[in-house]
Amino acid sequence: MDQYIRAIESQYIRKDFPEFRPGDTVRVYVKVREGNRERTQAFEGIVIKIRGGGVGKTFTVRRIGAGGIGVERIFPFASPAVEKVQVLRKGKVRRAKLYYVRNIRGKIRIKERRD
């Protein structure tokens, strides 16, 4: 049964994403429909979590918006609305889930990873 599910899911899994981890700063380009026209919107921030596997795999990106208010967006890896992902900076962290970043005020400093 599991092999059948994996075979069907493999059709929908995207391989064009770069490899990134929690702590990395990424820019996600999302297709947005406004009425009858479509445009691309960029969302830049720190990856605070990657969860799931297969078609249900998602990643959460957090940034500080206008007025110092934190904004988080969850993007599915398999979503056709996500056009592309750019890794701007590789961060060095010791956790898989960076929930503590939510409690930090101001700009977040994460050390850069050297690979």
Curated annotation (Swiss-Prot):
The keyword Ribosomal protein applies. InterPro entries: Ribosomal_bL19 (IPR001857), Ribosomal_bL19_sf (IPR038657), Translation_prot_SH3-like_sf (IPR008991). GO terms for molecular function: structural constituent of ribosome. Keywords: Ribonucleoprotein, Ribosomal protein. GO terms for biological process: translation. GO terms for cellular component: cytosolic large ribosomal subunit. Pfam families: Ribosomal_L19. This protein is located at the 30S-50S ribosomal subunit interface and may play a role in the structure and function of the aminoacyl-tRNA binding site. Belongs to the bacterial ribosomal protein bL19 family. PANTHER family: LARGE RIBOSOMAL SUBUNIT PROTEIN BL19M, RIBOSOMAL PROTEIN L19. This is Large ribosomal subunit protein bL19. The gene is rplS.
